[in-house]
Regions:
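C-terminal binding/interaction regions
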Residues: 2-23, 57, 62-106
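Hydrophobic "anchor" residues
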Residues: 35-36, 103
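A short, polar/charged loop-to-alpha-helix boundary motif
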Residues: 45-60
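Short beta-strand scaffold segments in enzyme catalytic cores
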Residues: 25-35
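Residue-level detector of alpha-helical recognition elements and their boundaries
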Residues: 29, 48-49, 70
Length: 106
């Protein structure tokens, strides 16, 4: 669990995004410069990505070169999505929000 105020801000962003979009999950990412990005799952026909991959795509579109942390709330991301993040930046902190609003390391 993290008590880092910056990670708790990501929790707030992810929860607000999930609530605002009425989505089953949302993710918030902080890059190594402190910029933040949010995303929800995307589905269009046969194409589907969870919120973890969606937030990575949004961040990569802004040319990030490192990830500090990602917080996912709602539906747990697929193991393959977690692997993508770990291979993108092995030092990235990755958390899932528990029902008690605690950050659990993935």
């Amino acid at each position: 669990m993290s008590s880092n105020p910056e990670d708790l801000k990501l929790l707030t962003l992810a929860k607000a995004t999930m609530a605002r979009s009425n989505s089953k999950s949302a993710a918030a990412l902080r890059d190594n410069t402190g910029r933040t990005y949010v995303a929800i799952p995307v589905k269009s026909g046969d194409f589907e990505v969870d919120s973890l991959i969606a937030v990575l795509v949004v961040a990569k579109a802004s040319s990030i070169n490192g990830i500090e942390a990602i917080v996912v709330c709602g539906q747990e991301p697929a193991p393959s999505s977690v692997s993508v993040i770990k291979s993108e930046d092995s030092g990235a902190k990755l958390y899932l929000v528990s029902e008690a609003d605690e950050l659990i390391s993935l």
